[in-house]
Amino acid sequence: MRTLALALTLVLSLSISVPARAAVDETNAHRLNALGLFLGTGSGYDLGGSATRLHGIIMLTRMLGEEDAALSFDGPCPFSDVAAGKPSAYTGYAFAQGYTTGVSATTFNPGGALSFKHYVTFLLRALGYDDGAGDFTFAASLDKASADCILQKQYALYRGDLVDLSVSALMTPLADGSATLAESLAKKGVFTWEEGRAQGLIGGGQEAYVHSSLRNTGAPKPEQSAS
């Protein structure tokens, strides 16, 4: 399945030291920040912090070049556990576009841990793969990677992982092969071609995501089935 091949491109498990991991995270955070795709927390990037489901939706809308549309969304948000304002706009927009179904019909669990499987599912959608049309399924999106010990998919995602996966996805071709995700964002005017090239995300080849199990020293985090 093309989706599994893409997942294997995005997720490559290698041994990497904590200092080296932190340096990669910081570099990639700067690259995304320069393009307006990743913002700090007010006291830095907090790359060692856990990524939440709301973080995943925000990053997805940016990766699709649709953040302005999300922030101006004035339709209903079906999730009673999402705060009013920007969180409601992001999640309401994502639901309306079919990017998320929540964890139930009325809850999204915005502060819940974002798993590798959830975020790679979001990235696959950003790349033009449609699980609704059978291009892939949430349940199978990382099964091959897990079976090959490429990814311990039961662990939650850290913000540094979110950044690194996003950089890899930006350099990955869209499902229709017309361009990379970064090139498509440049065409939409999210950033310029020159800015994309300056950050090495356009014309620089592809960078595989490197997962370090050293981050995941705690107990496994259970996943929720919906996305």
PLM-predicted stretches and their roles:
Residues 1-28, 34-89, 97-117, 124-157, ...:
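Feature responds to low-complexity, polar/acidic, surface-exposed segments characteristic
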